[in-house]
């Protein structure tokens, strides 16, 4: 694919101003408060694994991973890093860069699917670290009146947290400006040698939400699609104590130990009187042990189809709401995806948007001359069916997959992708999946790429498409502030990515399995996990500390 070699400068026409006027009207009356994203900070691990090394480790085709999926590297958390530290480090960057007084931050809502506790919000661990950092200057109670909570809906949790916080910030007044921070933080970890292993990544971020934002104004028009499915989930697994003991005995036998017949049953009967009955997995006296794993149960192909369907349906819902609000007139206005100078999407891997967006591209243009030209070359889309026969459904789905691929190879779509979507995938190629943060990483990647290429984005419209397995999609839009350069110029995203430390496959697998005894790179100038209490009434409590540079 050939990309533009010269800077692309959007032309501000009379039509553009018409959209801008409608955009303002969609916000409500003239007394409404304009709210949105004022700044974004991101923190990612200093460790990464080069995709060439990963391909060698797993015997994969690097060309397929790189050229086919857009993968170059994956971020890997060190021993002292977790969801809380990555989130806290990002919030600290945001506070320091913007000179915020913690006492003026009214809420910090965390979107994550990598929570560290089943009851205690991970956001409270983040507040604990931030209090350590800022208490000397602002007092031990500097975050006492800050509302915090975790929000979970797979990869769309941080988008949900942002929309919730936007509603709250919109109630700001001149006497009471509401300042909120939305946090995203996740470790996208998959089982070793699984089909999703090469899409791993990690990182945290913080989004400053307030009125009159310097980066992106977001109106209150949100398209939503929710369908309960099992495309990707992290269930609580249950394992019987008997099966655990039986597996240990089998392992001992395979290691050369002589095991007496019936020993497992005798051990189970003896357990209530045993000296180990109050230790470890036996402590609760239950027949089954609940096990949580960070690695998901997933069906990649099915999840892709859920993603395509949900985003298409959410886009349709967004367009309906925009028409009702007066923001959009389908008969007269240019199509939405043409109005949007950039399209920001959730990227579980870098080229996901390139592969998934053809549905919306077609749906938004079906009654246009341009689509008539495309359809003349491709032929009509496969006819929808009403069958409940799984064989017929699968045949139709495969036919639709082929039609989407055909759309993605047309000159019209290639140009569309290059000008509107491609810049968002550049940082994703270097980090991997960030779950809740992937859409915001794409946003940062787009802005910084346009800044480096001296593109004028002032007052341009962005379309944003979030997705979370389970499944839900949201489609909304934003208007770029003329002040965006002063914000983006302080990010240095790609410069920081270039300064990371590569690890070999032994270190990678040791970190993944929890066998790495100490930090690969000692923490400095960051928050770090220093202890997890192992017993007593504080069992499982996590302790963190700021480590000076």
PLM regions: where:
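Short, positively charged and aromatic/hydrophobic N-terminal segments
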Residues: 11, 18-23
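Condensing-enzyme catalytic core mediating Claisen C-C bond formation in acyl metabolism
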Residues: 23-80, 197-316, 322-325, 372-373, ...
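Conserved beta-ketoacyl condensing-enzyme motif
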Residues: 37, 83-159, 328-359, 393
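Acidic, glycine-rich active-site loops and adjacent beta-strand->loop/helix elements
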Residues: 43, 111-117, 152-158, 183-189, ...
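Short, well-ordered amphipathic alpha-helical segments that serve as non-catalytic structural scaffolds
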Residues: 61, 84-98, 307-329, 442-446, ...
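Conserved catalytic cysteine-centered active-site region
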Residues: 62-85, 115-181, 364-438
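Flexible, glycine-rich active-site loops centered on histidine and acidic residues
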Residues: 175-207, 212-213
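C-terminal catalytic subdomain
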Residues: 392-403, 418-490, 494
